[in-house]
């Protein structure tokens, strides 16, 4: 338990040190697609690790996509097309306990058969745009594209 808390604190401090506190962005990114009051921006020509994708989304005032239900999963799959994209899910801090990077409850799941594998180091979540199914993988095993979500501020 102490180890998980220490990892969480270390992660938070590292993120703040590397990127600082970001100012709210008022306008959605160009070419963003709206869904349920949020804006989704795909970077399908940019391969990155999960951490690189997370920080790139942070830098534009967004986050890696968090999927709350089947309708949103299908929406994201259609944007992803034939690409494999990073989602904001991880079990890095406690193996087998999946959480969304933004703190949302990890209720909806759409795992591919045999997933999550639970293999050592497979702590990051990807979505296959062909099927909409999820898989766990390592941060460096697969360089995937990213899809950033920006919450609409009212």
Residue ranges and their predicted role:
Residues 2-8, 19-154:
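Extracellular, disulfide-bonded carbohydrate-recognition/adhesion ectodomains
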């Amino acid at each position: 338990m102490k180890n998980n808390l220490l990892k969480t604190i270390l992660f938070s401090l590292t993120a703040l040190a590397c990127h600082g506190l970001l100012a709210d962005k008022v306008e959605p990114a160009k070419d963003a697609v709206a869904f349920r009051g949020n804006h989704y921006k795909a970077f399908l020509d940019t391969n990155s690790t999960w951490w690189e994708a997370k920080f790139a989304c942070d830098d534009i005032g967004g986050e890696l996509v968090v999927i709350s239900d089947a309708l949103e999963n299908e929406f994201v799959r259609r944007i992803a097309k034939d690409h494999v994209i990073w989602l904001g899910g991880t079990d890095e801090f406690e193996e087998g306990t999946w959480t969304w990077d933004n703190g949302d409850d990890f209720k909806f799941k759409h795992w591919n058969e045999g997933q999550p594998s639970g293999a050592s180091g497979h702590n990051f979540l990807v979505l296959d745009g062909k099927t909409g199914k999820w898989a766990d993988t390592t941060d460096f095993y697969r360089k995937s594209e990213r899809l950033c979500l920006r919450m609409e501020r009212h």
